[in-house]
Amino acid sequence: MGGGGYLEDRVIHPTLTLPNPTHSGYFDYDKKSQNPKSPLNPWAFIRVKNEIVTLEESLFSMLPAIQRGVIGFNDCDDGSKEVILEFCKKFPTFIPISYPYEVILKDCPSLWHQLYHYSNYTLSFIPKNEWVIKIDGDHVYDAKKLYESFYIPKSIKEVVMYSRINFVVQDFEVFVCNSGDFGFLDAWGDQWLFYNDCEPFEIWQHNGEVLETWQHNDDIYEILKLKDKHHIKDKELMQWHFPLAKKRRNAIVDNDLIPLKEFKKHHADLIGTRIEESMLDEKRILEMYQKFNLAKG
C-alpha cells in the first residue's frame, strides 16, 4: 500500500517557533536541557482518540520531564479534544493538531483515512534532526524516571526502547495483563526515544523482514523504520499503562490476568533492578487510578 509513506505525499510544515516553557521540571536542573538538539529536550509525540478517562492524568504526569510536544487528535467525542486544547492553552509549548479525517481501521477508502498517514501528519509538525519521544494518553509517567531516561542515548544512532506493564483494576484490586514475559513487556518496541532523521510511518506488510520497530493498533499495523539505529533498553520501568481504561475498551473482559502479588513474586529478580519496588505499590496504583475521569469511561 503506497502513498502516504512517501515524502511527496506528506504535509510538510515550517519549523515551529515555540515560546520558552511556562512550566518547570527536572529539565531546569541541567542547562543542556535548553538545547533543542539535545536528547534531554525531546518533543513529545502524542496521538489521542477518546482517552478522556486517563488523558489529563497522563499529560500532567509527563509534564515535569518534557518541555514541548505535539498532540494530534481525531474523532474525539468524549471531551478529549477540550482537555487537549485547554492543556495546550495553559502550556503553549505543546501544540494541538486536529487531524481533519476520520481514521478507519478496516476497508479504508483513501490514504488520508489510514492510521499511518495520521501518524505522519502529526509527526510532520516536529522538526527534523531533533529528538522525539512517543507518549501515550493511557500511560501515567514517573516524570523523574522519564527524564533520567533521556540521558541514555549517547549518539543520534541510538534509540531507547521502553518497557511497560499493563495494569487492570477490578474491584479495588490491581492485576497485570498476562502478556510478554508473565506480564512484563521488556523494551517492547512501540514506545521509544529517537532522533528524528528516520523515514515516515508505513503500513506494515510482513514479507519476512525483521522490523526494527512496529506499532500495533487493534487490527492494523504501522511501522516506523529506524534504519541503522542501535536499540537500547531502558534502565528501569518509568510508566504505568492502563489499556482497558479507554472508553472503547472498557467493555473488554481480560480473563488472563495476574494478581499483582503473583507478578511481584514471579519477577522478584527485576524488583530493585529493572523495576523500582514503589512502581508496584498497590496503594500507589489505586490512588492513581482513582484520579482518572472514571465517570466518563
Which residues does each predicted region cover?
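A short acidic, amphipathic alpha-helical/loop segment
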Residues: E57-S61, V83, K145-S149
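Short, well-formed alpha-helical segments that are part of the catalytic scaffolds
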Residues: H23-K31, N50-G69
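Short beta-strand/loop segment that forms part of the nucleotide-sugar
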Residues: Q67-D78, I97-Y99
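Catalytic-site signature of metal-activated, phosphate-bearing donor transferases
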Residues: M1-K32, P109-N120, V140-G297
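Active-site-proximal specificity loops/subdomain of glycosyltransferases
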Residues: T17-P39, G79-W131
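Short beta-strand-to-loop acidic/aromatic patch adjacent to the donor-nucleotide binding site
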Residues: N129-D142
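Active-site beta-to-alpha loop of glycosyltransferases that engages the nucleotide-sugar donor
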Residues: P39-F60, D75
